[in-house]
Design a protein with these regions (language model features):
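Bacterial N-terminal signal peptides
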Residues: 18-31
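Generic detector of N-terminal low-structure segments
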Residues: 6, 31-33
Length: 221
């Protein structure tokens, strides 16, 4: 047997309840908004965060930005890039970054790239340091002042080889066991990792290396 309990609510009570809801709604909105912003560390006042070294100038499709304090947030135009950040693109994703020395980086679809170090010393450009790590996929880099001035302190790592520059515009495609490099302008130095060419190093490796000039392509396996 079902028992139904009737509840009598007067018009005055309904009006009172409605007013309470209207008062509480703004508070609820503020709480939800604050909670959402707290979850997105891009909005946190994190004094320990390093200074920006670049800014996202273009995003097409799906791409994500991660760091030690931030996990897989969607990349947006205008986002700052810092040392330690990782950019990951999906099958339709493109991300362009302009760095503090006017270098340009393009991360193409199905790619993952880490900004290990980016230190541009405007007063003494020869002391600058740039180190990138292309875990997989394709990236294009157009050298800025740091790479042009401190060539011995620029390195782009891939899973199997190190790439140094000679003032360059080049494209690299990498997998776990292969690498393809195309030079549009300038030159690059490509060397497989070995005891004479360590992943933790900076600058080009000279041991067992190949130098590629403009218009040339190299495939390593």
């Amino acid at each position: 047997m079902k028992i139904f309990r009737s509840i009598d609510i007067t018009r005055k009570q309904i009006t009172s309840i409605a007013l309470e809801i209207l008062v509480l709604l703004p508070c609820l909105f503020v709480f939800v908004s604050a909670h959402s912003l707290a979850q997105d560390t891009r909005y946190n006042d994190n004094e320990s965060a390093s200074s920006p070294v670049g800014e996202v100038s273009l995003v097409i499709g799906k791409a994500f930005l991660s760091s030690a304090n931030m996990r897989g947030l969607r990349v947006r135009s205008g986002d700052f890039i810092r040392e330690g950040d990782t950019i990951r693109t999906e099958s339709n994703g493109h991300v362009h970054v302009r760095f503090i020395d006017e270098a340009v980086l393009s991360v193409r679809p199905r790619s993952e790239l880490q900004v290990l170090a980016y230190r541009f010393d405007e007063a003494n450009p020869e002391n600058s340091l740039v180190k990138l790590n292309l875990l997989e996929g394709t990236a294009r880099t157009v050298s800025g002042e740091a790479a042009k001035t401190a060539r011995e302190r620029f390195r782009l790592n891939t899973p199997i080889a190190a790439i140094g520059v000679r003032g360059t515009d080049f494209v690299v495609s990498a997998t776990a066991d292969s690498l393809k490099a195309l030079v549009n302008d300038g030159a690059i130095v490509v060397a497989p990792f070995s005891t004479q060419c360590l992943q933790g190093g900076t600058g080009p490796c000279n041991f067992n290396s190949v130098e590629l000039g403009g218009g040339s392509m190299q495939i390593l396996e």
